Amino acid sequence: MMQKYQDSSLSPEERASDLLARMNLDEKFGQIQCYNAIDSFLGKSVEKQNPYGVGQVCILIATMLDDVGSAAGLITRLQKQIMESGKHHIPAIFHIETLTGVMVTAATSFPCGLGQASTWDPEQQQKMAACITRQGRAMGISHALAPVFDICRDPRFGRMGETYGEDPTLAAAMGTAYVKGLQDKHRMSACSKHFLGFMAGQGGIHTAQAVVSPRELREVYAKPFQAAITDGKLDSVMNSYAAIDGQVPAGSKAILRDLLRSEMGFNGVTVSDYSAVEQLESIYHLAESPADAGRLALEAGMDQELPTIAAYNDELKENIRSGVVQESLLDEAVLRILTMKFRLGLFENPFPAENVQAEITPADTALNRKIAQESMILLKNDGVLPLAKSVKKVAVIGWHADSVRALFGGYSALAMKENTLGVKMSMAGIQADADSPAAENAVQKTYPGSEVVMENPGVEPLARRCYPDAYSMLGALRLAAPHTEFLYAQGYPYAGNEESGHDAALQIAKDADLVICTLGGHYGWNASCTTGEGIDAMHIGLPVCQERFLEKLESLHKPVVGVHFDGHPISSDTADRVCNAILEAWAPGAQGGEAIAALLTGTANPCGKLPCTVARHEGQIPVYYNHPTNTCYSMTGGTPKNAYIDGAHTPRYCFGHGLSYTKYEYDTLRLEKDAIQADGVLKGQLHVRNAGNKAGTEIVQFYVHDVAASMVRPVKELVGFAKVNLQPGEEKTVCLSLPMSQLAFLDADMRWKVEHGKVELMVGASSEDIRGKAEFMIVGDAYPDGKNRSFVADTKIM
């Protein structure tokens, strides 16, 4: 006889409730645990570790396997063992990182998070996520640990490159699109992270305490999560490591129950960041034992502990059995987990596709190349780009120029795979084995003048073997411009003060019509990297070896193009002075080399815009465009001049900045009405025209400023944007619909309030390049439900 939970015609909630009622304590407890698939290679079988079944499986080991078929085979074997371990045959959820694509080398590898944000293209983001879902689910992966919703205003923080930048509206738009694309038709579940305020850590230090007020926590840091919960029906959330106001999210009722569930209306599954529950005892000393840490987390509303059994252990289970810990806490967690499994269709389709092969279609590659091209930002250009036909000989200099590895950042499959070559890994929650063969053979030599371990010589051959169709920037340039001679010298590394290669590089520069210098660090996951998880820095500029080379190059009076690779934006007085043009390339992924070549040669027109403000110096940090009135670089009093005694308050490059090979003209911003009820919608429009002779794409940005308010408000805030494709001479109309609920802020009583008064609407090509303004009046006050307010204004192009 079919049981209710076996009836696929019933809702996931009904099926989960029925199954939960049939499970004993041991079976239920297994659902809040995770098995790390790497243990299957270490003699620790899933049957032995999780004899009553398991809720999740960490499948990061798939990155180390040779092909998709091997990964799918491992998932099939483990899933069969798990389902056979219990009378209800409950399948496990298999999770993997998907920030830049499914984290296996046979899947599509997209640009890093900052690069994705720089496209300002939610529609494209949704397509990217759909590609990730198709490739991941075919392998048997059902839980994607992405997107990253952290708001980052500090380039010292090594994980900035994972984020959508500094603005909550842009992050909400991009991340919600990712969630919708990934969760379409319930094929995979997205896991947004890290809740909450993670990258506001003091000193730009990974996992350090975040000093954020309750108001800012909700208005800024929670906004992308809220948008994904409300508009994207987000399935799961991962906690932050960072303590906030004395509380650690993994064990905080105030954060997980009161804020996330009660205030924000989240009813999905919460999962711990790796080892975060155990750290309540081992690092934060909030518990007396791992099991006590597990109790704190379960009481706080943490549903599953990843990536392996630590605090959700047998002692905690026996404490539940004896009544020391309430079984109802376990039941509510398991109910949510089972509901997600039924929603994903795992009971009907628990295994990978049969005979699965790598399926990177031509459409996937084209999408990846388009995202890579549009992720890059032309920060500066005096006319030297695109490369003129008169340029016959180009000197290309820098480690990144002829490196395929340089195209990939942290949370890419390649960054994970290179850890097999023996350099100490930096991923949080994963302990390096000091006695492993890899550690034994680790390269310990560092770049002179730094603590960065020299790159293993096997990394580049590994990169080219894993991505045989990927071109380095140099290789792509030679293909894109076959009649131009490209001379190459490494010149300098990506860290330290080594100058021994300068002379050879300067020699080829003397003979060239133009010089391309690749600049920046090494973005990844181990001790040979300069930025990444657990790899933070005091200095935000270029390494000394690159700065000194640029100073020497300046004396040759050659046109210089700088191409910057990294997980944070370029910040260099020397580069600004010496380079005639600067292209920010971030970590552009497998198609990055060809994307750069297309932009430099002019077959593509740059259209990326900065998702972050670029500081001149680390002493300015934090510097961000939507700062409160009379703060940061908008000070209006209290100092003799609007500057430090040794430098400007203003940033190097502003949020939203990005140049093109054409020019765009904006006409007058017109409003349908200049008085809007507090629960109404403002409508406006303007015309944008391509006034140049090259087709291009402009990102039209809308900002608001509260003229007078009851609380100190930001000097301006992004409310919406439109990406407009224009042929030479073409004009299009951009229409804006802005619900007043999007302008709600927390009043003195911490209620969401749309407040009566004047508001200035601005439109521009960046946060500082404002092309038009219009003022309107909000009539009356309104108190919207914070979780159902508007998050991103709607725009249409006609």
Model region roles, listed by residue range:
Residues 1-744, 756-763, 767-768, 784, ...:
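Glycoside hydrolase catalytic-domain context in secreted enzymes
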Residues 747-749:
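Flexible, membrane-facing loop/turn or short amphipathic-helix motifs
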Residues 752-753:
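Surface-exposed, short loops/turns at beta-strand junctions within beta-sandwich domains
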Residues 769-785:
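Short beta-strand elements
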